[in-house]
Amino acid sequence: MEINIITNKINKLIQRKKDLKRYLDYVAKSTRILEIDLELSSTEIWKKKEYVHNLNKEKNLLNIIINKINNIEKNIKEMIIFLDLAIETKDNAIIQEISEEIKKIAEKIQELEFYRMFSNQHDHCNCYIDVQAGSGGVDAQDWSKILLRMYLKWSDKKGFKTEIIEESTGEIVGIKSSTIKVSGQYAFGWLRTETGIHRLIRKSPFDSGKRRHTSFSSIFIYPDIEDKINIEINPSDLRIDVYRASGAGGQHVNRTESAVRITHLPTNIVTQCQNNRSQHKNKEQAIKQMKSKLYEMKIKEKKEKQKKIEKNKSDISWGNQIRSYILDNSKIKDLRTGVEKYNVQSVLDGDLDDFIEQSLIMGL
C-alpha cells in the first residue's frame, strides 16, 4: 500500500477520533470523573454508603468511554511513529502491519460511534429477556428454545454474562417460557429493540407430512432497574404462588416448593424465579423483576400515547411482529428495518448485530 494512501487513512482516523471526543462529551466526562474522585477523597462521604455506591457506578460508566477513547489515541500515536520508521527504513513489512492496525482502530472507532445510540435513561443497565411460546403448539415451544439459544449465543459473543432465572419446559420439546438475565455494558441498550413477535416459517419436523408450519414466540426485553426507582407495588395487588422447580437443577429439584411465581393482578404481569434453592431469594428476585416490568410498562404507555398524538397508526397484530425467519427459503427479514440475512444458521447462532444496529440507527 502506498505511503500517501496510509497517511490519508490515518488522517481520517484522527478526524473521526476528534469528532468522537466531541459528541461523546469527552471533556465533560473527564471533568466529572475528577469531581467524583474529589468527592470520594472525603472521609465523611463514606458514611453515605448508597451515595458512594452510585458515585462509583457513575464513574465506572464514564471510564468505559474515556478509557476506550484514550486507548484509540494511544494506538494512533503509536501507528504514526511506526509509519515514520517505515518511511525511514523503507520496510514493507512494517507498512503491512500498519495497514492491518488501521482496520483494527477503525473498528474500535466504529464501535464507539455507535454508543451515540444509547441515549435512553436505562440503556446502560443490565436487562432481562422473557421468551414466551405463542401459537403453533409444539413448533412454537421448539422455536422458543431456538430463540433462547440465539440470544445466549449473541450475549456470549458480546462478552456479556447470562443467567437463566426461570424456565418452563415444553410438553414434548422446547420451552413454554423462560427468563434470562443479561449482564454487561449497555446490555439493555443493545437488546431493547428486540422486543416483539418473532415468526418462524418452516417444514415442521413434528409433522409426518413435512408440511409448512408457522409458529410464533414473543420476546420482551426490560432493564434491570435499581431498587431506588420509585415503583410502588401494593402487596394486595400481588398473588404469590410457590411450586416445585422443573428442569435441570440437581438433587434438590422437585423436592421442595422453592420456585416462586408472582402475578400483578391489575395488569396480569407475571414474573417467576426458580434458580435459587431458597424460596425467600426467589421471591426477592421475582419482586425485583416485577418492578422492572412495571417500570418498562409505564415507559411503553408513554410512547404509545405519543404515537397516538402523532397519529402513527398500524395494525397491532402485524405491528408487533418484528422479524420473520423463513428457514425453507434460507431468509430472515426484519419487518421494521427491511434488513435481510440469508445465512440462517449464522443468525440462529447469534449473528444479530446487523438487525440490532439498524433498528437503533432508525430510532425504533
Curated annotation (Swiss-Prot):
It is found in: Cytoplasm. One of its GO terms (cellular component) is cytoplasm. SMART domains: PCRF. The keyword Protein biosynthesis applies. Keywords: Cytoplasm, Methylation, Protein biosynthesis. GO terms for biological process: viral translational frameshifting. The keyword Transcription does not apply. The modification N5-methylglutamine is found at Q251. One of its GO terms (molecular function) is translation release factor activity, codon specific. Pfam families: PCRF (PF03462), RF-1 (PF00472). Methylated by PrmC. Methylation increases the termination efficiency of RF2. The gene for this protein contains a UGA in-frame termination codon after Leu-24; a naturally occurring frameshift enables complete translation of RF-2. This provides a mechanism for the protein to regulate its own production. Belongs to the prokaryotic/mitochondrial release factor family. HAMAP family: Rel_fac_2 (MF_00094). Peptide chain release factor 2 directs the termination of translation in response to the peptide chain termination codons UGA and UAA. This is Peptide chain release factor 2. It comes from Buchnera aphidicola subsp. Schizaphis graminum (strain Sg).
